[in-house]
Amino acid sequence: MDEQISKAVEIALSGTSDLVLKNQAFEFINQIKSTEEGYKSCLDILLKSINSNSPLNQEFKFFILQVIDENITKLNNEQLYELNSDLFQYLNYVINSNINDPVYLKNKFAGIMGNLFCFTYLSINPTFLKDLLALIADNNLIAIDIYSRIIIAVHTEISDKFISRSREVQDRNNLLKDQIRTNDMNLLVDNWQKILRNPELIQHNNEVLNNFLKIIGYYINWMEITLFISNDFINIIFQYLNKPDQRNETCLTLIEVISKKMKPLNKLELISLLNLTSIINSINNDDDLEFMENIAKLSNQVGLELVIVLESSELELFDSINQQFLNLWPSIFKFLSHEYDDISQQIFPFIQQYLLTCKKFNQLASIELLSSLLNKIILKMKFDDDDDGTDDESTEQFNEVRLKLKTFQDTIAILKPELFLEAIPIVINESIFANVSDFDKVNWRNLELGLFELNTFTESLRNNLINLPKQEIGNSKPYVLVQEFLIKLINSDVVLKVDHPKIQLGFFELIVRHYNFLNTNINNQEVILRILELFSSPLGLFNNSEKVRLRTWYLFFRFVKLTKPTLNNSSFIENLFIKLQPLLVIKAELPTKDEDNDTVENGNFNNQLNLFESIGLLISLLSVDISLKVRMIDLIFQPLFNDLENCISNKDKVNQQLIALQAHHSLMAIGTFARGYDYDYNNKYSAEIVGKINNASQVVLITLENFAKFEIIRDAARFSFARFIPILNEEINNHLSKLVSIILAANNLKISELTNFLNFLGQIVHNFQSNDNIYKLLNDLLSPLLDKIFSLLKYNGENNEYESMPDIIRDKESLKKSYMNFISAIITNHSSSLLITETNKQKFPIILESFFVYAYNTSEPTVSKLAITQLINVVSVMGGHGGKINDPQDKYGESLPPLEGVDEYLMNKAVQLSFELPFQKSEFDLKDAQYRLVGQEIASLLKTYQEKRGDEYLTFLSNYLTNMGLSSELMTDFCTNLVKVDQRAFKKYFITFVTELKGK
């Protein structure tokens, strides 16, 4: 067996073994791990290696230890006793033979001993720790090394606070700790102190020394602290702060020491006794960044512990605690000012807690202290001199730090508004405007800091951090000061002269974010023109940096949309639009593939659309003669029309995809321009403007006719028409029929495309519900549209492959929802008669049947609920009226003949659905929120029918419930509630009714 196990491990670890053989080896290995026979065999192999003095190879030994470790929890007390004896025998062998295994083997063995300790110390081997101490009595380095690892492993098992444990295990661990305190604590601590005091005993081995420092930090958490904090012991630990190889671990140990839970007075005495603030202030090892980071962590923990003491102590301790704070702040300031952010961030938690505590203890918030802190924070928020601000990753990291610093600054603003209002304007003024007469002296980092602080200062007013009465904010001195800063900045050339992306983007972001401060300016028109001029300069829309340029295109759109400037300077406007012409030239680029073979779209065009939308909005808002508006529209549209004409006439068959993409982009630009023009919904569009959009719709249709086989063209055409509707209104009638017929006739219409098309048609129904021409269009369209919908929903691919394709399943679910929402749009917009005209009445039973089919489909609860909603809509307009439409606002409803039998069909099927769905579908669980919503919708259906049909419905329902086997008492109660309570109350009743019946 020994040889089999050894061979199996060798094969499993081999990189060249036959795959079949390797799988067999793994199967055998797993069997060894999981059986008692395998465990015993591995333990025997380990013991034989001792007796024969023939060491195992390292990989095989690790496997043996792994098997032993994984089986400890399965052993009975007798087996645990034997294992305890065997492992101590093995440990003796390792020590006496001076076997220095690799670290991973030593740690694995230590982990086994730590695990074994938990099962043996209480009753099987109470001398476990004394036995360990006996092994290191002669100061053998290998023995002390393994001993330290076992002690750490015991900590991991019984008190590591980062490991989640069951209540049972935690109770056991508490008993283990109690027994250690009683039997072994003093011996252990004396031993640790001895080793740390005499590092020569372990030949100054750095790893072992660090292990013992860790042990102090681990065990002090639950041992008696007085054993550790005698002057002698503390001085021993402190001396390691001067040893390069131990000082980092020493910092972490001291953090654990001061973190021990204690009464406030005792904790304060401990901090005073350790005198850590003086020690920290005396350390200056800037060259060792890791050490400085750990010292900063230690400073931070001292501060946090003082905060905890203050918040949980009596007021008479305040002066002593405050003195400790004052002693600590020099080191906090030193670390906050450190050039490396990783070091500075270590003291952020303390700063945050201190500032929050200042809200409770005003005495802490001295002007002198907070002023110094604010100055340090501001300086830290500036880009470092060696950072050129162009690396995205480092900028992101810096912004994370800056965001935390801003939080501190905001808290200071709340604590001491007068300090904030005095300091920040000085920073803004000196950073932005100090060298306006000599731009060569302007450092972009200073300017960027000024822009950032101007932004934060403005936000502080918006959020009223300085606690002004709301009605006074707009007239307050800080508010006026912000306006002055913004106007001064806009009129200054400083951002034009400092060529840096951070300045350019920072400026435009600032202006857009705080546009409302400009809207109240008395010279608003002049300021707006200046901003538009800056946007259209090389600083913004024409910037050489693509990142700045594309972002500015979006910011330009946001600015125009937010401010809605009403411009009346004709020459400025005309020059502006002519200047922007080069940016409106569209050049399509086909998607490319990245290294992972994923499709990468060219993002420039989507950014370019922001310009078209901005210009559309600007033209719509012009306070000028209509002829100028028309000329501006021509200036935008004509190049697009020419481009589309070129696409249509281009017969290059090789580049059809690129040509279609070019046409798509031009159509999207036209539609997006129209969307911008429509932002002012109160606009009364003149005949000239309507004429221009009408021309555009004709161009769109011509393009669609020529590229009808391309989905992207159909999408773009639909997009454009959706944006034309508010402007053209009923003028669009002339074009819609053609648009719809071309799209529906497409042979390659996708499910997702039809889904979007139905949403578009729903918009048409809503906008033109009283338009006779649109009614006729929809009447002619409805039946073929329904055929298309049901055809796509039914088709599952040539070999039913769609049934297992999540994307197709999801698309079909979306199509069902859009189809039902379209029917809902017809009914709720008083056009229900469309469903039963002579043209469409043959489809109406199919529509109703689809609603019932979808309602019963519990695998799609959202679809089921929506289907029931549509049944409620149908019942509302047709239930109880002999198949006639009952909607006074449906002007064609009265003239149509009734549909025979629809009442009986609806009532019968609706009642069946209402009880079969919740009671016969096992997966219908009302504890599930989605099914609960379906149940509530069923209740609404029942209530709606009762309100429509009254006693006739109750009679039908009573007969159905009787046949279903419901008792007369329950049936009476159900019908009484159905009649007497409102819909909301009946929903609750129905849910309870179903829940209780299903529970019986």
Swiss-Prot record:
Record-linked SUPFAM superfamilies: ARM repeat
Transmembrane segments: none
Database matches in Pfam families: Exportin-T, Xpo1
Keyword tRNA-binding in annotation: yes
GO cellular component assignments: cytoplasm; nuclear matrix; nuclear pore
Main location (coarse class): nucleus
Subcellular location(s) of the protein: Nucleus; Cytoplasm
Superkingdom of origin organism: Eukaryota
Covalent S-S links between cysteines: none
GO MF assignments: small GTPase binding; tRNA binding
Cytoplasm among keywords: yes
Function summary: tRNA nucleus export receptor which facilitates tRNA translocation across the nuclear pore complex. Involved in pre-tRNA splicing, probably by affecting the interaction of pre-tRNA with splicing endonuclease.
GO biological processes: tRNA processing; tRNA re-export from nucleus
Protein name: Exportin-T
Gene3D superfamilies: Leucine-rich Repeat Variant
